[in-house]
UniProtKB/Swiss-Prot annotation:
Family matches, as Pfam families: Ribosomal_S2
Record keyword Cell wall biogenesis/degradation present: no
One of the GO biological process terms: translation
Recorded GO CC terms: cytosolic small ribosomal subunit
Family according to the record: Belongs to the universal ribosomal protein uS2 family.
Database matches in InterPro entries: Ribosomal_uS2, Ribosomal_uS2_bac/mit/plastid, Ribosomal_uS2_CS, Ribosomal_uS2_flav_dom_sf
The organism's place on the tree of life at top rank: Bacteria
Gene coding for it: rpsB
Protein name, as recorded: Small ribosomal subunit protein uS2
Alphabetic keyword roster: Ribonucleoprotein, Ribosomal protein
Gene Ontology molecular function: structural constituent of ribosome
Length: 251
């Protein structure tokens, strides 16, 4: 039995690809036809890839693995953050900062700075500072929360990343490839399948399509590990990957 039915894929519009002028020839094997200037994705192949990808996610989750959710395009931001929070997984929905994976040690210093500022404000000690400094520190805190708040509990490199639109998130995919971190992706007809380890060929623009795939992944994580905000923290204590990998690659 498949994790997702053909009916669900059709109703969510997963089969609608990009305009034929926007495509990657390497994606050809997942295309069924072209109609009115739009590529139609072969949902039979999508179903096979869903089973393969979701089997991997289920197995990884049962072993305590951590998946970093990435979706910075407008249609994906809210959905990706919601499912990541529901499962306790780290996420990036604002902008991918170069080095988030390959220079993770430096990224941790930004997270530590955010924690320091949070303590300053929450303790009330911020009121001991001059008004101009309070405003400056408040802006810094807000900026750090926006960019690294979703990964603040990520104490080591993730075991995999899930990406909505790997073409847009090309830097995240490149960093994961460089470190040997598996990439799971909802990928449209403009994507390069060769840089994706577990591809779900489908519409990565439509909200219903993004929601169907991302929510089902969330369900898998909850079912495998019970869900909750502590899921990622537990996973951080397990697995073989550490931030030392990033340092080795940088060296």
């Amino acid at each position: 039995m498949s994790y997702i039915s053909m009916k669900q894929l059709l109703e969510a519009g997963v089969h609608f690809g990009h305009e034929t002028k926007r495509w990657n020839p390497k994606f050809k094997r997942f295309i069924f036809a072209e109609r009115n200037g739009i590529f139609i994705i072969d949902l039979q192949k999508t179903l096979k890839q869903v089973d393969r990808s979701f089997d991997y996610i289920k197995d990884l989750s049962e072993r305590g693995g951590v998946i970093l959710f990435v979706g910075t395009k407008k249609q994906a931001q809210e959905i990706v953050e919601l499912e990541a929070r529901r499962t306790g997984m780290p996420f990036v929905t604002s902008r991918w900062l170069g080095g988030m994976l390959t220079n993770f040690k430096t990224m941790r210093t930004r997270i530590d700075r955010l924690t320091e500022l949070d303590e300053l404000f929450e303790s009330g000690r911020i009121n001991d500072r001059l008004k101009a400094e309070r405003i400056k520190l408040g802006a810094e805190r807000e900026r750090l929360q926006r960019f690294v708040g979703g990964i603040r509990k990520m104490t080591r490199l993730p075991d995999a990343i899930f990406v909505v639109d790997p073409t847009k998130e090309v830097i995240a995919v490149q960093e994961a490839n460089k470190l040997g971190i598996p990439v799971i992706a909802l990928a449209d007809t403009d994507s390069d399948p060769d840089v994706i380890d577990y591809i779900v060929p489908g519409n990565d623009d439509a909200i219903r399509s993004i929601q169907l795939i991302t929510h089902r992944i969330g369900d898998l994580l909850v079912e495998a590990r019970g869900g909750g905000e502590d899921v990622a923290a537990e996973g951080m204590e397990q697995g073989a990957q550490t931030d030392e990998q990033a340092e080795e690659v940088q060296a």
